[in-house]
Amino acid sequence: MSAGWRLRGNSRLRVIVGLALIATVTYASYQAGRFSGTTVITAPDEAWASNDASSQAFDNLLTSLSFAASEAYSASQTGETGLSSDKSYEYLLELLAASIEMQLSKGDPSAPEFTDWMSGYRKFLGDSPDARYLTAPIDSAYDYELTFDMGDADYLGVVIYDTNPLTGWNRASDSLYFLAENPPRENLIRLASRDTSTQTNDQPSGYELQLSKTAHTVMVRTYRFNAAVEDNSRIAISVDQTRPREPVDDALSVERRLANTTRFFNETWRGSRALARATASTANAFDQPAEVSPDFVGIFYPTPDNSYHGGAFDLAPHEHLVINGKAPDSAFWSVTLQNHWMQSLEPSIGQASLRGDEITVRDGRYRIWIGALPPPEGENWLSTGGLQQGLVAIRYLLATSEEAPTARVISTKHSMDEAIR
């Protein structure tokens, strides 16, 4: 072999060895990172947060999440939820995200901001595909101004919530609404405590809602009567600077807002579970539960212009729950299926929500079949997508005439034929 070939051969060998070393180091680095990335972090000493109030509040929030996950896991194992534990974990994390935004990031009533409850991926407390819910924290120590534009929304309603002194539950203390067919003459709503609203006759233009001493939340709801129309409504809230008042707190501390985050998270998931358990006792019948847990208080946000009906379903694969009712005289109505945690079912499983204008009505009455399999031809159908257990939410908006619908289980083709005669 010539010297030239030996030189080139040695060069190739050096290149091969170098590449092998690079590959070895890269693989070792990957494995080290993979190992460290999957290593479980050791739990801290239980006393780590004992000497600091904010740390205690932070630890309480994490403890609440862990406890809720353990309860959700147990409920999934017993079949109580009809869902896998993974689905319940997704719900809890969605609720946590909303709780943090609502009570921590935007939880200061001296500088309020609206939280869009069902923004993006989040679903909780009986969401509806046709509605939008926004809330902001308020305090009677301040006056507020709401500026809004209904956009293409067909309905916009505002509710002030305070605390019922007898029960401790949320109470709708004042409210108003607008319909697109009779639009507002002004785009300003003032929120004022009773003493400031009567101090002067020099009132600015717009509408006014009164704040009681225990007022804590303002909720704005918008509805689209046509699902093809996107909700482009806009609303903002600010402290009324023309009426300076002595504030209770210039800003809520992180400790306080963390505590409020934990409270809202706990009350909401426990309240949702309480409702599901209560209605499960009368599944497939729409009867009033004989008993409701005090935990139900966590989801009680009454709306003066909505009436609600429905209950739970618990169906075998070959069964249907058939709802019979009188079509209400209302501005809007809908029937929506939800899971154990009051989350509307995904459209990907099939039609799981119907507006009144989508429901076939015969002689002033409607009939809706709920189940995994299609009903007889020409009948209204809501698909469970194979979900055995869940909730049926029927809402009538601004109803002037209504009656409570009924429900019964149909289990065979013969019975199906009998039901439609």
Model regions and ranges:
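N-terminal Sec-pathway targeting helices
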Residues: S2-L21, A28
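A compositional/structural signature for long, glycine/proline-rich flexible linkers
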Residues: A28-R421
